[in-house]
Amino acid sequence: MATRIRLRRMGAKKSPFYRLVVADSRYPRDGRFIEELGYYNPSTTPATVKIDEEKALKWLASGAKPSDTARSLLQKQGIMARFAEIRK
């Protein structure tokens, strides 16, 4: 199973927020997922990001590949840097 860390769109029309989830790469964007890692709300000023670092590191260590946007959010939270330290 090829797992991906990606954003799942939620919220009302024209006012989205996103949940950061781990899902099989074959599932649809807003479909079934394995585990929720956090959320991202771009509508607030500044944008709200909350990610469970321990869960994210566990999934990265087990081989989950983040999407481009998810990778950007993980880098801003410092999780990708911590993952790189752990891997060395």
From Swiss-Prot:
Pfam families: Ribosomal_S16 (PF00886)
SUPFAM superfamilies (alphabetical): Ribosomal protein S16 (SSF54565)
A cellular-component GO term for this protein: cytoplasm
UniProt keyword list: Ribonucleoprotein, Ribosomal protein
Domain of life: Bacteria
GO biological process, one term: translation
GO molecular function: structural constituent of ribosome
Cysteine pairings via disulfide bonds: none
Gene3D superfamilies, sorted: 3.30.1320.10
Protein family per UniProt: Belongs to the bacterial ribosomal protein bS16 family.
Protein name: Small ribosomal subunit protein bS16
Species, as recorded: Syntrophomonas wolfei subsp. wolfei (strain DSM 2245B / Goettingen)
Lineage: Bacteria, Bacillati, Bacillota, Clostridia, Eubacteriales
Annotated gene: rpsP
